Amino acid sequence: MLFALDRKDYAGCTHVHRRDSARAVIIRSGCTAMVYSRKYDYYKFPGGGLEPHESAVAALQRETLEESGLRIIPASIREYGFVHRIQRSMTDETECWVQDNYYYICDAEAAVRPQKLDGYEAEEGFTLVFADPLTVIHTNRRPKQTPYDPVMFEREARVLEYLRLEKYL
């Protein structure tokens, strides 16, 4: 485990919603592949939630291709670590949200394919960028008005800090 994001605000929750995810760490020339939300001004690593009965690696490949247009080279995939997140749901105070976010260092083919975005992703203007890690960290820590919990932005900033400390970037 890289680290945990535990709000400790879930006393009284009566049920758990679990949705694990897989995220790609693709590094080129000291920059990382990130999906940028033009609408809300934040960055996230390409990737997303695991479907029922889907492996983390399969979700990594599928979600990265859909969100960014980058096709991961399967032989390059290496586990980096995971971030454990647990907190009360933002929409249901009786629900505890639990998520393990699995990060994989990998390479992608040079060609960028068309994105296959979900409705909300297209509405947010998801765009693939290769970004300077410090720019991402600064942007994600700047206060913003979004429908999302700021823990998501902090998660990505902290993973980038770990990658910098470990000399990947």
Regions found by a protein language model. Name each.
Residues 1-23:
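Acidic, metal-coordinating catalytic segment for phosphate/diphosphate chemistry
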Residues 16, 42-43, 85-88:
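Short, solvent-exposed loop/turn segments at secondary-structure junctions
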Residues 16-18, 93-100, 120-125:
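A generic structural micro-feature
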Residues 27-67, 71:
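Conserved Nudix-box catalytic region and its N-terminal flanking loop in Nudix hydrolases
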Residues 42, 112-169:
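Nudix hydrolase/Nudix homology domain
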Residues 50, 83, 108, 133-136:
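Hydrophobic pocket-lining residues within nucleotide cofactor-binding pockets
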Residues 71-82:
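A short coil-to-beta-strand element that immediately follows conserved catalytic motifs
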Residues 85-115, 129:
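Active-site-adjacent beta-strand/loop module that shapes the phosphate/pyrophosphate-binding cleft
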